Every structure is written in structure tokens, then in C-alpha cells.
């Protein structure tokens, strides 16, 4: 509000406390008496002078007032009171500024009051008047000298009038807002009532109807949407998301739902679900637990469980399943299934494995195997009890029978039973007070005694444990002596704690040991080849005495010691025989699986070891320090897969410890065989020459050699063949016999596995199992096994008689099983050779492998798609056939260097049994042509003329001629060495 000059005019002068005194400059009204014309001129001049003085004084005073107005105005603006010597004009100026501030504050207050005022217009007018009077009263209280001043009153009235439009507008706006709020409030109540207990699927229809009602009440869509959003968020805060679900049906003209347009609703849905989860933790836990159990039981697969988890997270706001929890569950289940598969393999190996069974597996696997047997036989017992409905003693009898079967299996595999160790520990804790009046055998003791009776005698120490078995034997001895169960247990406890042996006991024990060693060393009475040498007897006696003393200290009686010494020595000391009456090599250690370890038939082990000694005889004797050949023996550690050659009863090592793989069984057998053939042929030649000299050409006829088969030689061994009439008559090994057959087969399957899935696609490294992966033909698993529709439907693959699951999270397809599956697939792809010149079984193993590789890659009848090759195979011209197959190195009509390499490898596989040159290089050129190079000179004796003519003098042969655009995508140009 501007202060105008006219607003402060006409005021009387005010007394000033500074400057000229009021007495000196006070304004006076000078009255001039009328004078006669003849009056004194002096008096007139005097009066005129006084008037001039008054005019000057008035001007000065007016200027003083104006200055004071400005000064008081500035003081008011800075919040200061008027000065004590302010003029009336200055005081009014100060008052106007204060009035301006007060009026503005009062206007803002009235505008704010208007928003909350609930009276009528008359009451509002009274409220405004009262507010004005309050301002005016405060003004007069502050400036009492201006009270009643008309000009000041007019100024106050004008100030109020200037603010009146604002106050009126605020009142009208507030009235409109209150009306709108009333409509919104009414609609809010309507929404709350109309949507109470309405489920989510019906909420959308209810909200759409309410939206129509809102528009009829002059509520805009935006206002309605905001109201619904807020109410939905409020409900979500207490775990109810029904209204939020309904907002998904409220769509604008563009078809976008309110839910999608308002982020608050989306976060509100999550909050509602989380609140629900917090309020229903038990229910959520039950849902999760049921899902986990269903998954572990195989009722849900991985995809189904993920969908269940997604549903749980949707109803719980993402709190039910975290990423780490999901991964942990899948990893745990995958590991469990992989472990189960591994245990099944162990159990199967125990059922059908080598004579040594599971002695070469790790300690952890042995414990796992024992645990697996507990689970397996407990399940079998429970299944039979359920099936038969047995109860009470009948059910216990079934459990006892399966427990005995379990102990028998542990004994067969020499696996220590953890349950027996636990029972032994509890029995050793029984005090004399507990045992004093004990008349009945405790359950723990019954378990140990049942185990002892169920386990083969020579396996009891290994299965039960040395001290545990000694305890059982001593308890049995005490009961035979008439002790009560309590007394017998105490007797067995004391025997188990003994550690010193009297001299008389030692003498008796030594005599018993001498008898056992003599029995073992004597070998067979019919054939003397397996009788132990004197050095072997000395070695046995030394170790037998050590074992006997240890067992005696542990508490074993002499009968038990003798039985176990005999079993141990028979397994750990073997005098191999080379023929009925010829002693072979002495072996310290278990030889029952030595043949498998060194890659030879078990019957050929004596021949292999003898050939090894012959090959290194001089070096071994030089290192023995003067020992003889008969003093050398093999010290074999089957568990570690190591051996040492020692000399004499002093066990002097003449070689360092070496892996058993150093003994190349097949190579040594081949060397021995070739030597025997040479000796036989020379002897036969000399014999026939003598016969010719004695009887003439017509007097002697060489007998026709007897025939044998590769299968017979493989099962009975080379040594047996060398002693057979067939060999003596001049027959050599069959043409399709192969040294290192098992090793070569293993290498072949490993090669195919690497070729089919060298990157190990689909292998779950956490669980150690294979899962399906996609390839060009669909879904495969393991080493290129194509999943059939039936397998996909069943969820398992049949490998032999085993049904093996393969789905992610449930897979039990371990690498070992994947290799068995590959072997099964390879054999199933063997082409039919019914009308071939050479049946498949009569082919050399190398040719068999080459054909299996082709058929596995191309399909069982894929060879028929190459007519020239197929005709050659049928005619028995295998080299021609494999060379013709080189031109099938294409995929989808494009030439592939990778496939050409594989065809060349198949050719090389087929040549493993002969002297035909192999392919050493493959070349691909930019013009699309492809070539292979043979490592040696090809002869017409090996291939047909047509093929021989294609091979250059440098060994290179063109497989494909040049052709633009013929190479498959990704095919590399250049040479590849095989």
C-alpha cells in the first residue's frame, strides 16, 4: 500500500523534541487590526515582516513533517516503533505500514479459515467483520493519537476494501472444495460399502459400476482413480489385495488399466502379499513344505516346482522363495539324486563286480555303501511287512531276516558296518553294577551276535572290526563256559582291554601260527606248481606272527586267530603256477583283481608277471645284491594300485614303488605269444624235417590244425591257448583276436563320447550328472543320446534294466551311466550283416568299431545311403568301404571338415589290426575341394584298382572336387593332422 502525500495533509503541526524549539517556531495566527490610512507606516512594516517570518517558518515545519513521514515509514518496514518525537504525519505513515502488514496477515488467516469454515454466509460475514474490528482495535491501541481521525479512518476502510475480493474468492473456492470433498467422501463410503468382501475376480465389475456413479456425481475419472488407488493401497497395507486386483479392469480410453498406470498399486500388491505372508507364516510354510516334499518324491518336476514357487511369491510379495533358496533346493536335490545314483552304482557293483568287490573304493564311498545297504534292506523289510500285514514278532522276524542279508552283503564286500561299532561302544560303557544281575542279553549285544553269525567267517574282522569281533568271540566263549550274559559281557570287556601276553601264551600261540603257515604253504597235493617256496614260507611266518600277536592282545582266542590267519595268508600270499608242476612268480598281496588292473585275463597273470621279470631280469638281479632269480617276488598293493619287486626274506626292494599300470599286460602277452609261436614253428619244422628224412614224402602227413575262436581265447586266456592242442597243432590266434581288446574298446567309447559332446553340454557340475540339451535334431543327453518321445514322456532312460531319470533337478545320469548308455546306443546301431560275406561277430574288433562309429553318426541304416561303400562292406572289402565313406562328410548338403575328420578316424579304427596305411592328414581348400593323405604306400593288395588309381604317389587322395559354395558354415580351410 503506497503512502500518498494527500493522506497526511491537513494535519495540525506536532511538537518536535529536536531542532528549533516549539516556542521559537510555533505557528501563530496573527490578527491585524484595521488601521486608518493615516496610521503609522512603521507598524505596517513591522506586521509585514512578522508575516514573512511566519511563511518561512511554516515551510520549514512542513518540510520537517515530510522528512518525518519517510523516517517513520522506514522504521515501520524494519519493524521498529515510531520515534517519540514523530509528527502526526509520521505517526500516520508508520500506522499505514503496520496496517498493511496486519491486513495481509488477517487476509491470509481469513483465507485459511474459509477452507475449514462450516457456517452459512451470514455467519461468515460476521466472522469477517469481527476480524476487521479486531484489526482496527489493535490499530487504535497502538496509535491512540489517531483514534477518531477521519482521514485515518478512511485509510483503514480503504485498506480493508482492497483485500475484500481476495477474501470473497477464498470463501467461494472453499465452498466449492467442500462440496467436492463431500462428494468424494460420499463416493468413498459408497466404494467401501460396495466392495466389502468382494473377491478379486468380481472386484473389477464393481469398480466399473462405481466409476459410472462417480461421473454422475460430477466426480472426474482422475478423482475417482485417485480415490480408488488410495483405498486400494490402504487395504493392501493390511494384506488385502482384492481392490488392487480389481484396478486391473479399470481401463482408460487407450485400454491401459489403472493398475498399470499407477505404480503405487503395483508396489501395493507386493506389500499386500508380504503382509499376508507375515500374517500367515504357518500357512505359507505348509505350502512350501508340501511343494518341497512333492518335488523330492518326484511328484513335481523342475518346471512344475518353479511354477509353484512363482505362485507362492505372487501371493507373498516375493518373500516365499528367494533366489538363493531356490538354487540351494535344486542343488541339494540334484546332489541327492546324483548321490543316490552313485550309491545305486556302488550297490550294483557290489552285486555284479569283481571278486574283490568294493575294496578299491575310497573310505567315504565304503561308508556311503554301508549306509545305502541299511536304507535298501530296511525298505525291503518294511515293504514286505506292509505287503504281508505282519505285526509283532512276525514283523521283527522279517526285519531280522533282512538284517542278516545285509550283513552277508557287507561280508561279501568286506565293508565295515558302522552300526556294529556303535553297539560295541555302548557295551563297553556298561559298568560292573549294571552287569551284576543281568540275565538277558541287551539289544546291542544281540545285534553284534546276529551280525557275527550272518557274516562269512573270513570277512568278520573286516566287517565287524578287530576289537568288535574279538568282543563277540570272547562273549561266545564265556557263555560256553557257563557264564551269565552279564558275566560274559564283563569277561569280554576285560579281554578287550588286555595289552600284555605271558611267555607261556606266546609259546602256545607261536605253535599255532607255525601250523597255519605250513597248511597254507603246502598248496595242492595233486599239482606241485602252487607249493610255496622256502622264501615264501619265511615271509608268511614273519607276518603271521605279527598279526597273531596283535589279535591276541585285542582279545581273540586261538581258534579265531587260526581261522583268520589262514584266510588272510591265502589271500595275501600266492605262489603262481605256470603249468601243473612248474612254480611261477610269488606275489605278496591280493591277486584276485590283478588281471583287471594290468589289463589281462586273470588266468594270464602268471605269464604276464613272468614275462615282466624276464624282460628286466638282469637289472633286477644287479639291484638285488647277489640274490638269485628265485628270490624275486612282487609286492602288490591293490588298494593303492602300486607294486614293488623285492628280493629274499629280508624284503629288500630292488625297484621303487611303481603304479601297476607299468605292467603292460597285453603287450607282455603278445611278446610271450610271438616268442612261443616262433619256438613252436621252429620245433615243428625240425620235427617234420626229421620225419621226412626217416619216412620220405609219402610216409608222413602233418595233422590238420585244430580251430579255436577269439571269444574262447579271450575267456580262457593266452596261457591256456599256448598249452592247447590247437596251438600245438600249428593253429595261431584267430584273425579277429585283438590284444588290448578291453582297453581299445574303452578308448573307442571315450573317443566317441568326446566327439559327440566334447564340451560336456548339459553337465550339471554341482550335482555331477547330465541333463538334456538342445542340438540340431532336438533334445539329447549325455554323449549324444537322442531323447525319444517315449523317454521324454516317461522322464527316464532305460539303461540295461535300470530306469534312470534325466530331467534337471531329478537326473541320476552320472558320467559312468552316460558311458554305459553310449555303449548301449553304439551296440544298438550295429548294422544288420545277415547277408554280408563276413558277419559282424567275425570281423576284427577294429572294423567293428569303425562300423559302429559310422552307424552311430549316420543312423543304423545310414551306410546304405552310400551304395558303393555298402556294396564293398557286404563283399567283405572293408578298406574299400571305409574309403568310399569318406565322401559322406556332408551335412545338409554342405561339406564339413569336421565330418571328414570323423570319417577318416573311422577308417583308421578299422585298420588297427593290420598293416594297411592309415590316414594321417585331412585338407580343406578354399575352392571347396577336400583331400586325405595316407601315411604309407597303398598297395593293390589292400584296395581295389579304382580306388588305388585315385591315390597319388605322395599319398594324397581327392575326396571332393572343387565346387563354389560347397563348404558348410564354420568349416575351416587348411590341414588337420590326425
Swiss-Prot record:
Keyword tags: Antimicrobial, Bacteriolytic enzyme, Degradation of host cell envelope components during virus entry, Degradation of host peptidoglycans during virus entry, Viral genome ejection through host cell envelope, Viral penetration into host cytoplasm, Viral short tail ejection system, Virion, Virus entry into host cell
Principal location: virion
A GO BP annotation: symbiont entry into host
Stretches for region Disordered: 9-29
SUPFAM superfamilies, A to Z: Lysozyme-like (SSF53955)
Composition bias type Polar residues, residue spans: 14-29
Function as written in the Swiss-Prot or TrEMBL entry: Exolysin that catalyzes the cleavage of the host peptidoglycans during virus entry.
The protein, known as: Peptidoglycan hydrolase gp36
Organism of provenance: Enterobacteria phage SP6
Upper classification of the organism: Viruses, Duplodnaviria, Heunggongvirae, Uroviricota, Caudoviricetes
Amino acid at each position: 500500500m503506497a503512502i500518498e502525500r494527500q493522506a497526511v495533509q491537513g494535519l495540525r503541526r506536532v511538537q518536535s523534541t529536536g531542532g528549533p524549539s516549539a516556542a521559537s517556531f510555533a505557528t501563530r495566527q496573527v490578527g491585524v487590526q484595521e488601521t486608518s490610512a493615516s496610521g503609522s507606516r512603521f507598524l505596517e512594516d513591522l506586521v509585514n515582516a512578522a508575516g514573512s517570518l511566519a511563511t518561512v517558518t511554516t515551510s520549514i515545519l512542513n518540510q520537517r513533517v515530510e522528512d518525518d513521514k519517510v523516517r517513520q515509514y522506514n522504521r515501520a518496514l524494519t519493524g521498529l516503533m515510531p520515534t517519540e518525537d514523530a509528527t502526526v504525519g509520521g505517526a500516520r505513515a508508520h500506522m499505514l505500514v503496520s496496517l498493511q502488514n496486519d491486513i495481509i496477515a488477517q487476509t491470509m488467516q481469513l483465507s485459511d479459515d474459509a477452507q475449514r469454515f462450516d457456517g452459512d454466509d451470514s455467519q461468515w460475514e460476521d466472522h469477517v467483520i469481527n476480524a476487521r474490528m479486531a484489526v482496527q482495535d489493535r490499530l487504535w491501541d497502538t496509535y491512540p493519537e489517531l483514534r477518531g481521525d477521519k482521514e485515518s479512518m478512511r485509510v483503514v476502510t480503504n485498506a480493508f476494501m482492497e483485500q475484500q475480493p481476495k477474501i470473497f474468492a477464498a470463501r467461494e473456492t472453499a465452498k466449492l472444495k467442500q462440496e467436492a470433498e463431500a462428494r468424494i467422501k460420499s463416493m468413498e463410503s459408497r466404494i467401501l460399502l460396495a466392495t466389502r468382501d468382494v473377491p478379486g475376480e468380481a472386484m473389477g465389475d464393481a469398480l466399473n459400476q462405481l466409476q459410472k456413479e462417480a461421473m454422475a456425481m460430477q466426480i472426474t475419472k482422475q478423482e475417482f482413480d485417485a480415490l480408488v488407488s488410495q483405498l486400494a493401497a490402504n487395504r493392501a497395507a493390511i494384506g488385502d489385495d482384492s481392490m488392487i486386483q480389481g484396478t486391473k479392469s479399470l481401463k482408460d480410453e487407450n485400454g491401459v488399466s489403472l493398475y498399470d498406470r499407477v505404480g503405487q498399486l503395483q508396489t501395493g500388491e507386493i506389500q499386500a502379499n508380504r503382509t499376508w505372508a507375515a500374517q500367515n507364516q504357518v500357512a505359507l510354510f505348509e505350502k512350501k513344505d508340501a511343494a518341497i516334499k512333492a518335488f523330492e518324491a518326484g511328484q513335481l518336476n523342475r518346471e512344475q516346482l518353479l511354477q509353484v514357487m512363482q505362485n507362492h511369491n505372487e501371493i507373498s510379495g516375493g518373500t516365499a522363495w528367494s533366489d538363493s533358496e531356490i538354487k540351494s533346493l535344486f542343488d541339494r536335490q540334484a546332489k541327492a539324486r546324483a548321490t543316490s545314483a552313485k550309491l545305486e552304482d556302488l550297490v550294483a557293483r557290489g552285486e555284479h563286480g569283481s571278486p574283490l568287490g568294493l575294496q578299491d573304493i575310497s573310505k567315504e564311498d565304503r561308508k556311503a555303501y554301508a549306509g545305502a545297504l541299511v536304507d535298501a534292506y530296511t525298505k525291503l523289510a518294511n515293504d514286505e511287512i506292509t505287503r504281508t500285514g505282519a505285526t509283532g514278532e512276525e514283523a521283527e522276524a522279517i526285519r531280522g531276516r533282512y538284517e542278516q542279508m545285509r550283513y552277508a552283503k557287507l561280508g561279501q564286500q568286506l565293508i565295515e558296518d558302522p552300526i556294529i561299532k556303535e553297539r560295541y561302544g555302548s557295551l563297553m560303557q556298561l559298568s560292573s553294577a549294571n552287569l551284576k544281575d543281568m540275565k538277558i542279553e541287551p539289544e546291542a549285544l544281540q545285534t553284534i551276535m546276529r551280525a557275527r553269525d550272518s557274516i562269512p567267517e573270513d570277512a568278520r574282522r573286516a566287517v565287524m572290526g578287530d576289537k568288535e569281533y574279538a568282543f563277540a568271540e570272547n562273549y561266545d566263549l564265556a557263555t560256553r563256559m557257563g557264564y551269565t550274559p552279564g558275566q560274559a559281557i564283563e569277561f569280554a570287556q576285560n579281554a578287550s582291554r588286555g595289552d600284555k601276553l605271558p611267555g607261556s601264551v606266546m609259546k602256545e600261540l607261536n605253535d599255532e601260527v607255525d601250523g597255519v603257515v605250513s597248511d597254507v604253504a603246502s598248496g595242492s597235493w595233486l599239482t606241485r606248481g602252487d607249493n610255496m617256496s622256502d622264501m615264501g614260507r619265511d615271509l608268511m611266518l614273519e607276518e603271521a606272527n605279527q598279526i597273531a600277536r596283535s589279535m591276541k592282545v585285542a582279545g581273540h582266542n586261538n581258534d579265531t586267530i587260526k581261522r583268520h590267519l589262514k584266510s588272510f595268508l591265502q589271500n595275501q600270499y600266492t605262489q603262481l603256477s605256470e603249468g601243473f608242476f612248474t612254480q611261477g612268480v610269488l606275489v605278496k598281496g591280493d591277486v584276485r583283481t590283478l588281471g583287471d588292473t594290468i589289463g589281462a585275463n586273470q588266468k594270464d597273470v602268471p605269464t604276464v608277471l613272468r614275462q615282466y621279470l624276464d624282460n628286466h631280469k638282469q637289472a633286477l638281479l644287479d639291484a638285488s645284491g647277489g640274490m638269485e632269480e628265485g628270490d624275486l617276488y612282487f609286492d602288490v598293493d591293490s588298494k593303492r594300485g602300486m607294486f614293488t619287486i623285492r628280493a629274499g626274506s629280508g624284503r629288500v626292494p630292488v625297484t621303487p614303488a611303481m603304479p601297476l599300470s607299468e605292467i603292460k599286460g597285453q603287450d607282455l602277452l603278445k611278446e610271450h605269444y610271438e616268442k612261443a609261436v616262433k619256438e613252436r614253428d621252429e620245433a615243428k619244422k625240425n620235427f617234420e624235417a626229421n620225419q621226412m628224412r626217416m619216412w620220405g614224402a609219402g610216409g608222413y602227413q602233418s595233422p590238420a590244425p585244430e580251430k579255436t575262436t577269439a571269444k574262447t581265447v579271450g575267456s580262457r586266456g593266452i596261457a591256456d591257448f599256448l598249452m592247447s592242442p590247437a596251438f600245438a597243432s600249428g593253429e595261431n590266434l584267430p584273425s579277429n583276436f585283438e590284444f588290448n581288446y578291453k582297453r581299445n574298446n574303452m578308448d573307442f567309447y571315450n573317443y566317441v563320447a568326446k566327439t559327440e559332446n566334447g564340451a560336456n553340454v548339459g553337465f550339471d557340475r554341482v550335482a555331477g550328472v547330465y541333463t538334456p540339451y538342445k542340438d540340431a535334431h532336438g533334445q539329447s543327453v549325455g554323449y549324444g543320446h537322442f531323447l525319444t518321445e517315449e523317454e521324454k514322456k516317461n522322464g527316464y532312460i532305460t539303461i540295461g534294466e535300470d530306469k534312470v531319470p534325466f530331467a534337471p533337478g531329478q537326473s541320476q545320469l552320472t558320467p559312468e551311466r552316460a558311458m554305459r548308455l553310449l555303449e548301449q546306443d553304439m551296440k544298438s546301431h550295429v548294422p544288420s550283416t545277415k547277408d554280408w560275406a563276413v558277419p559282424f561277430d567275425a570281423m576284427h574288433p577294429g572294423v567293428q568299431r569303425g562300423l559302429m562309429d559310422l552307424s552311430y553318426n549316420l543312423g543304423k541304416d545310414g551306410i546304405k545311403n552310400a551304395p558303393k561303400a555298402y556294396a564293398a562292406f557286404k563283399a567283405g572289402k572293408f578298406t574299400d568301404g571305409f574309403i568310399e565313406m569318406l565322401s559322406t562328410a556332408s551335412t545338409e548338403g554342405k561339406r564339413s571338415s569336421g565330418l571328414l575328420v570323423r570319417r577318416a578316424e573311422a577308417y583308421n579304427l578299422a585298420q588297427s589290426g593290420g598293416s594297411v596305411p592309415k590316414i594321417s592328414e585331412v585338407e580343406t581348400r578354399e575352392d571347396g575341394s577336400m583331400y586325405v593323405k595316407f601315411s604309407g604306400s597303398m598297395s593293390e593288395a589292400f584296395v581295389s584298382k579304382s580306388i588305388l588309381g585315385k591315390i597319388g604317389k605322395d599319398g594324397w587322395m581327392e575326396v571332393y572336387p572343387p565346387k563354389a559354395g560347397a563348404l558348410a558354415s564354420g568349416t575351416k580351410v587348411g590341414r588337420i593332422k590326425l
